[in-house]
Regions:
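Fe(II)/2-oxoglutarate oxygenase catalytic core
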Residues: 1-157
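A short beta-strand-loop-beta hairpin characteristic of the jelly-roll/cupin
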Residues: 168-188
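A short hydrophobic beta-strand segment most commonly corresponding to one strand
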Residues: 165-168, 192-194, 208-225
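Intrinsic-disorder/low-complexity, polar/charged segments enriched in Ser/Thr/Lys/Arg/Asp/Glu/Gln
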Residues: 35-39, 162-164, 213
Length: 225
């Protein structure tokens, strides 16, 4: 198609330059590091991770009151002796700008991450226990949860009190993680990803199957307000 614009200005030139090449559609199916998200050298066996997920779900169902909205959690750690989990235990403090005022506001209560120091005995002997042990040898691990996200679903655009480690267990090419201005796919291949969720971020599942990650909070500093 030959189109001759009636006006030749900077906008026409910008679009013409953009039309001169095709966007990269291959690398979006891979991990690309960026500010706020890095792949660590530590790696686990993806087959054993997926087997452990099925084994744990036979022992305990996903929890949470927002499962119909696509968010479900399975707590892998607990306070010593804990047997019941509140909605706040499964989610916890975050901040967001909710409306046209663009004012940042807190939601939910702060969770003392260091209190969640004990692996959930319901899942003792699973590969997830080994994962937790290996993480705890290297980092100050707080709450560790298995988080499930339904298809065609997205979290809020928010920030957390602390960074998190992500280990994808089940994923698809349409499952993406965004931290501030950087977006990338996290393949489910046993890799461990550092995500600086102290910055604004979200997880979205634009694929046709569920997305399941192990998410471990890094309890270096306890935010108190």
């Amino acid at each position: 198609m030959t189109f001759v614009p009636q006006i030749n200005d900077a906008d026409v030139e910008t679009v013409a330059r953009a039309m001169g090449s095709m966007p990269d559609s291959a690398s979006v199916a891979e991990f690309v590091p960026g500010p706020g998200i890095q792949r660590l050298e530590l790696k686990f066996d993806i087959r054993l991770l997926q087997e452990a997920l099925e084994e744990c779900l036979q022992r305990e169902d996903f929890m949470g009151g927002m499962q119909d909205q696509g968010f479900a959690a399975l707590p892998l750690t607990r306070r010593p002796g804990q047997s019941e989990w509140t909605a706040n235990d499964l989610s916890g403090r975050y901040w967001l700008r909710a409306d046209e005022r663009y004012v940042e506001e807190p939601r939910e209560d702060l969770v003392p991450e260091v209190d969640f120091s004990e692996f959930n005995p319901k899942f003792a002997g699973t590969y997830f226990e080994h994962v937790h042990q290996e993480l705890a040898k290297r980092f100050p691990i707080g709450r560790t949860r298995v988080l499930s996200k339904g298809l065609y679903n997205c979290n809020s655009w928010h920030r957390d009190p602390e960074p998190r480690l992500h280990i994808p267990v089940i994923s698809n090419p349409g499952s993406l993680f965004i931290v501030n201005h950087h977006v990338t796919h996290l393949p489910a291949d046993g890799s461990v990803y550092f995500t600086d969720t102290r910055g604004y971020h979200t997880a979205l599942n634009g694929g046709e199957t569920r997305r399941v990650h192990i998410v471990a909070a890094l309890a270096y500093d306890q935010v108190t307000e």
